[in-house]
Amino acid sequence: MLDIATFSVEFTEKALGHLESFRGFERNIILDAIKAQLPHQSSQETRHRKLLRVNPLADWELRVQAFRVFYEVDPENYVVRIIAIGHKQHNTLFIGGEEMQL
């Protein structure tokens, strides 16, 4: 029998602020994707999750349509920590209304 641990998902204060900046239906899309994608095997690359190269923001990215969820995984404590949430317009990433470079 295969036992797959379930990770709890935590949001930083900044990430909660980023989430609040989106419209209600956008928040629902983002939260539904987080619930579906991150509690199980959150550190396994998939079509929507990827390990990022070294950057000051986070280790992992979850792509949800034009939205990006940046997170870190703590495998010892079974925690996924959401660091930032933004959206992409063409090749430009915006987090908290500011353009970001990764």
What are the residue ranges of the model-derived segments?
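Short histidine-centered beta-strand/loop micro-motifs
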Residues: 19-23, 61-63, 72-74
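Arg/Lys-rich, positively charged N-terminal/basic patches that mediate binding to nucleic acids
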Residues: 1-33
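Active-site micro-motifs of SAM-dependent methyltransferase domains
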Residues: 17, 36, 40, 87-90
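Residues at the C-termini of beta-strands that transition into short coil/loop
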Residues: 13, 55, 86
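Enriched for short, Lys/Arg-rich terminal
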Residues: 1-6, 28, 64-68, 72-102
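A short, surface-exposed loop/turn module that caps and links secondary-structure elements
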Residues: 36-61
